[in-house]
Amino acid sequence: MPLFYETEVRSRLLLGTARYPSPAVLAEAVRRSGTDIVTVSLRRETAGGRQGGAFFELIRELGVRVLPNTAGCHSVSEAVLTARMAREVFGTDWIKLEVIGHQDTLQPDVFGLVEGARILTGEGFQVFPYTTDDLVVAERLLEAGCQVLMPWCAPIGSAMGPQNVQGLRAMRAEFPDVPLIVDAGIGRPSHATTVMELGYDAVLLNTAVAGAADPAAMAEAFTKAIDAGHAAHGAGMLEPRDMAVPSTPVIGKAVFS
């Protein structure tokens, strides 16, 4: 089972809670997915209001662990402030740290990310950093105190699937003992299977489920795909070959001359 900051979870799917058609649809998707962890974006305008209160009550009723995030933050100071507020609201040291560096692609500001991680780990936070597949940045995040890495496979919400499989493979090889969660860009269950076959520990999804015609059914499909990819990696898959290899034995085969 995956282990994140000494916390063991059963499911390898982390599910976002934004953009669902209704709270009821969200609740059913969470249940069908079997997830242990949901991500929540803290907003000042709803945290203390009636809408925010009802949403947080729904999350509590689902009995899942909350991973607050700093989505939408474009500076270190904004991300750190949001993280501190989230700790007060949710009573957890977990934080998914996002520092956005580019408005159109929502690419992480990796320099701000490392700085923010250093500040927050110094304050006792357990940081889940949304990052790229750059190995140097990953090393800096680990040096800053992170014990989990969350590389993207494509821009947030793009549904493009893994754009740099070799980069993701290299990260897994470079950090074999670090929990790795693919975050952002997954669009189909087959995408999730692909990254799990590389040996990743988990996948974080939101748009691919929330935007589906049937979010609850899609959540269940992703769970099955993730489990299949994980099982395939553990079973030991064949490596691609350049040439054909006969799969049918030739012993006892008739020879015509």
From Swiss-Prot:
It is found in: Cytoplasm. It comes from the Bacteria. Pathway: Cofactor biosynthesis; thiamine diphosphate biosynthesis. The active site is at 96 (schiff-base intermediate with dxp). InterPro entries: Aldolase_TIM (IPR013785), Thiazole_synthase_ThiG (IPR033983), ThiG (IPR008867). GO terms for molecular function: thiazole synthase activity. 1-deoxy-D-xylulose 5-phosphate binds at residues 157, 184-185, 206-207. Its EC number is 2.8.1.10. It catalyses: [ThiS sulfur-carrier protein]-C-terminal-Gly-aminoethanethioate + 2-iminoacetate + 1-deoxy-D-xylulose 5-phosphate = [ThiS sulfur-carrier protein]-C-terminal Gly-Gly + 2-[(2R,5Z)-2-carboxy-4-methylthiazol-5(2H)-ylidene]ethyl phosphate + 2 H2O + H(+). Keywords: Cytoplasm, Plasmid, Schiff base, Thiamine biosynthesis, Transferase. One of its GO terms (cellular component) is cytoplasm. The keyword Phosphoprotein does not apply. One of its GO terms (biological process) is thiamine diphosphate biosynthetic process. Catalyzes the rearrangement of 1-deoxy-D-xylulose 5-phosphate (DXP) to produce the thiazole phosphate moiety of thiamine. Sulfur is provided by the thiocarboxylate moiety of the carrier protein ThiS. In vitro, sulfur can be provided by H(2)S. Belongs to the ThiG family. Homotetramer. Forms heterodimers with either ThiH or ThiS. This is Thiazole synthase. It comes from Rhizobium meliloti (strain 1021) (Ensifer meliloti).
